[in-house]
Design a protein with these regions (language model features):
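Conserved thiamine diphosphate
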Residues: 1
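Extended, largely alpha-helical regulatory/partner-binding modules appended to the mid-to-C-terminal parts
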Residues: 126-127
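Alpha/beta enzyme core
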Residues: 4-121, 134
Length: 134
């Protein structure tokens, strides 16, 4: 819908109309990974019979052991929380274009270890052309 907070009634009406016109998969995303903000979206979309893709915002180098917040355990916890919330798919969004092939392998392996059967999508808005990948 956008990068702002919407009143609950607007969210509900949006999904009612989206479902009516054939939208059946919704990607929910909070750029700060504050997944409590996604709960209403997941509930409304699921109750309308839709499928929900919960999206993690990749914002830190998980290969750096000095990272205290955005490490592998952080993303594993988010993955479990999204699954418990009821999402049907999982996505990792690399908005900062900082994922390298090595780190992507490490991250995907860790997420697969938690939810081996959940579909996993990767999004690279920067076309996966990070200078760190060269």
């Amino acid at each position: 819908m956008g990068y702002i907070n919407y009143p609950n009634n607007v969210v509900r009406e949006f999904f009612k109309q989206a479902s009516k016109y054939g939208v059946d998969v919704l990607c929910v995303f909070n750029y700060l990974d504050y997944i409590n903000n996604l709960k209403l979206f997941v509930d409304v979309s699921s109750s309308a019979g839709g499928f929900v893709e919960g999206t993690l915002s990749y914002t830190g180098d998980t290969s750096d052991p000095k990272k205290f917040k955005c490490n592998i355990d952080y993303y594993i916890k988010l993955t479990r929380d999204l699954s418990d919330m009821g999402v049907h798919y999982l996505a990792v969004k690399d908005t900062a274009d900082i994922l390298t092939p090595c780190v992507t392998t490490m991250l995907v392996s860790a997420l697969r270890g938690v939810l081996p059967d959940m579909p996993l999508h990767m999004t690279f808005p920067g076309s996966c052309l990070s200078p760190r990948s060269w």
